[in-house]
Amino acid sequence: MFKFFSGFGDSNEKEIRALEPLVDKINQLESSFSALSDEALKAKTAEFKERLKETFETTASAILKDIAGTTAELEEAQKTADNSKQSRLKAKLESLNKDLSVKENAALNAILPEAFAAVREASRRTIGLRHYDVQLIGGMVLHHGKIAEMRTGEGKTLVATLPLYLNSLLGKGVHLVTVNDYLARRDAYWMGPVYHALGVSVSSIYPMQTPTEELPSRLFDPTYTSETPNDPWMHFRPISRQEAYKADITYGTSTEFGFDYLRDNLRPDLAQCVQREMNYAIVDEIDNLLIDEARTPLIISAPDTEAGKLYEVFARLAPRLAAGKDYEINEKDRNAELTEDGWANVEKLLSREGVMKGSSLYDPQNAPLIRHLRNALSAKEFYKKDHQYVVKENEVIIIDEFTGRMMLGRRYSEGLHQAIEAKEHVKIQQESKTYATVTIQNLFRMYRKLCGMTGTAATEAEEFSKIYKLEVVIIPTNKPAIREDYGDQIYKDQSAKFKAVVNEINEMRNLGRPVLVGTVSIENSEMLSNMLKRQGIEHKVLNAKQHEKEAQVVAEAGKPGAVTVATNMAGRGVDILLGGKEPPKDDDKAYSQWQVHHQQVLEAGGLHVIGTERHESRRIDNQLRGRSGRQGDPGSSRFYVALDDDIMRRFGSERIQGIMEWAGMDENTPIENGLVSRTLENAQKRVEGYHFDVRKHLVEYDDVVNKHREVIYAERRKILLGADLKSNILDMIREEIMTQTAEHTQGYDSSEWNLEGLVTHIGGIFALPAEINAEALAKLSQEEITELLTRTAEELYQKKEAEIGAGSMRLLERIIMLHTLDSLWVEHLTIMENLRREIGLQAFAQRDPLIAYKNEGHVRFQELLETIKHDVVHNIYRVNIQIQHQTESATAKAASRPVQQQKPLPAAPAAAIPGVSAKAATQPAAPAAKEVGRNDPCPCGSGKKYKKCCGK
């Protein structure tokens, strides 16, 4: 059936061949589904669901019963300190859930041919698109939890409808993850009629603009019409966040899915949570998210106070330090290390500024200054305006190195963004305190079934397999690919290279071919634009500064003779159609004109792509090439390289320069041969291998905090679900009494016991009756003391409950547990961040930093658990409910009005790579009752001022 397997490899071909019988079966069903009425086609969904239900009742009922029993048993075990039993039950539950997934997939496989046939027919009737056979193959690969590599223009958006519909039949919700908000709306709206024809609901998650926004999402509903004139989304009905997640299929970005997960784990009430179980997700452009964005965790934080003075001091200091004299630059690892002369110079300058304490920068009290120094040097050497960021409206905005887009709202973390703001003399914003965080890697590893689509995944197949356990399957094209990829041309310097680029642009343009030129930075795109203007060559520029015009520029990029200069992969997700954007067929004049242009470009040779520099990743280069030659169209591509390009300067340019000098070539004569191309490719492979190791290391480090997060979030959810907190808290009290009694009554001689200390400590937990004092306890044995204090604690607990009522006591238990858990978890995250930064020093002691981090992290986590128990025990008797309306904790407020951040973490602490953070501060929600003053007593009853307690 499929003839285009050349170069795919035997295993990939076998994978495709194994799916061919299913394609044949779907094709055989086509005529019978075409004969169905619209109502009968929609009724197929109810039929499929009923068949799945019947299958589960016969094949999975025992597993479901076992899961329920094991879950109940685990909840009981968690009330005790039997860790071995808990571990055994968790392992059993994980195994049972895997067995259930196998049963579910088997049931879905049984109805796959009919379900795919139904989607194909619904698509043909509603949007006029019929799935090709290769698209059916792509849908099956996605359903099986693998990555489908499909070339540009092969219809990934349409392919996704097949597995999304099939897996939505389980009723657990499925997610389609896009690379930006526009595509989340466009794809949900475009495919909406297909799902609606099948009786399946589809929603799109919109970014929340304010914390009080009630309807930050949309549901496709043909019966609804927007009141906004010329609304491109006229059938998108506004709905709440919870309703969006209750839809059968939900489209959104990784950022929105991730922040909703974090926000749900900060909410004070389960009824406020929006997400369901993480069931099945298809990630569009999966390489962009799980490879390029892998080092970017999602963080919810709030401003932390730190004066901007130090940033300004170091912004003045950095230009006074000379590279090569005061510090050495390591471009490969992107860091700068001070020389001995540099240390002396810095100490002298800082003393003059009056910010250094003592006589040496090595003194412990000067440790924060070293971080400021590193950030200032990084801002000076590695973060250049119009390369890594732009300054717009007195604000530093990050540029996405992979797409060239402005990353509005994102900020570098760990003080780097502030250092750049100081360098650029714009307002320095406050640093942040982390309330909740999860890496992109761990977020998507939570899904029971994960898959993805992209045009370029094969080069990263090893990483997908090792980190995510995802197999890459290359899907054959619907038509043979005929694009011609020319060899690289290498020049001695940038000037000669860009002159040659301009000449080739002019040559192709004169042939009537559209030209797409990819640059690596805004600066290069604007420099090339100026060169083209001087030559009188009409062109469009697409970079972060013009991102608003992106859709329009991409739509016109395929016209005859059109020249488009774009940073990297700006416009990814939108096809460049030869002849320009295809107009509606009912517009005779416009459509006729488009056909002429389309044919003209085809005959001229199609779209020509020029890369002005090799990227560190072959995959990014392939993405640029992939803009040309879609759906069997003609096209070509060529890369131009200079010896002073970043990748050439960092890897292997000396060898190539030696070849050029040996050949006696001048600067305007290019070299083009296999040796140079292989050298370049080997350099890219080395960089890819380095970044793979970085990301693999990141997973290993983040898994430490991830295990902590799983435990804390599970405990938090149990509290919200109404777990028996009373027995848990009483157990904590008994344990505290036993521990303190044992500690204060050591030794056989009771005269040596510290009973005064014991009475003081227990009196700090609850008010002891007058008759229980050191003198009375001296007459008792250790066991009798423990028994007396425990009995007294239980009686006082019951007395408190009788005074305020059982319902109020349960509420008080929940408030104290949540407040304690949340506040201490925030502190623990800060401790782990600091530990991660410092642990790299273990390498100097010949210790593996990762092992040291795991060991230290375990100690810190045990301390966290003990501190939680301690604080709960010491607060439960002292705190009273004084008002009807529960006041939100600081953590709950962070959930409603987060400062959202994203930052790449170093793979290992020694790497010292400052990260990226995203900030989208919003206004606080209006209070339900009279606002509490900062100096008023806290309404939670702690006795502290509001600003020192819940108002932090």
Swiss-Prot record:
A Pfam family: SecA_SW
Biased composition (Low complexity): 916-930
Cofactor binding mode and count: May bind 1 zinc ion per subunit.
The protein's required cofactors: Zn(2+)
Membrane-related topology note: Peripheral membrane protein
Gene Ontology CC, one term: cell envelope Sec protein transport complex
Keyword Nucleus among UniProt keywords: no
Superkingdom: Bacteria
Purpose of the protein: Part of the Sec protein translocase complex. Interacts with the SecYEG preprotein conducting channel. Has a central role in coupling the hydrolysis of ATP to the transfer of proteins into and across the cell membrane, serving as an ATP-driven molecular motor driving the stepwise translocation of polypeptide chains across the membrane.
Protein's UniProt name: Protein translocase subunit SecA
Organism: Dehalococcoides mccartyi (strain ATCC BAA-2266 / KCTC 15142 / 195)
Source species taxonomy: Bacteria, Bacillati, Chloroflexota, Dehalococcoidia, Dehalococcoidales
